[in-house]
């Protein structure tokens, strides 16, 4: 009968209960609230009460979480939230399929894997294409996953070096006007890249390869006039490049190289009337076969759940605030 309550059962191994259930059963409570079911745990057996569709979705979701837990994953609230969004689309099995895509381990032995469909598509694009643009809000893993792919290619001797770069003009500051030598000037801008490499490679391995010139972390301006062969190159914060800077960077690419360009169009530090090189490149290059584009969204945020809510709130606010821009003239071939 339509709307009738059914009862389903599933088992959770005793050694995985705390991981799957969450602290104070927060994961189960979240599943209950979202899918409108009741979950009762007794001696490792879960009794799920709800409508036929909701109870079935809850059972599939919990079974997927158990599979993830058995593979050594720590189940987080973000995992559960994402699993619930997939359950709403009747795509529960996608979560464990994504989890099969192993990239590498951190120095502490933690596996690095894509955690969402958007991240999986991004990683697949990196494997297939010579140049990939990964664009999306903070917390979507676009830079970290690119770093993990770079380290994997380096370890597998697919490339002979890793080059990481960022535009060094952010928040209105120019390197030439900052005190100190080059290293002290660029460190604040490049620190996030160092931190990610330390976590993946370990400080000792990073320092050794840096000393040998096999890893280079430098401002974007230092790419000018070079040809970058047999390298895995990551340009981070590309929304802060000008069209000329990004064109300069992309034309440095040599044989045997792979390039990842990451950026967040909502966090530009360019002067108000400046055109972002990232925006221009995504329009100009979209029809070239060996260039991939991956647009990550708030659904792909894998930091604290609050970050996802912040991103969504700002997106909604900016859509309301965005004025109609009058047509402008052209300078240097780019619309201003």
Locations of the language-model features?
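Short glycine-/aliphatic-rich beta-strand segments at the starts of folded cytosolic domains
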Residues: 2-19
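Interdomain "pre-motor" coupling segment immediately N-terminal to P-loop NTPase/helicase cores
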Residues: 40-99
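Conserved loop-to-helix interface motifs that mediate assembly, gating, or partner/ligand docking
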Residues: 89-117
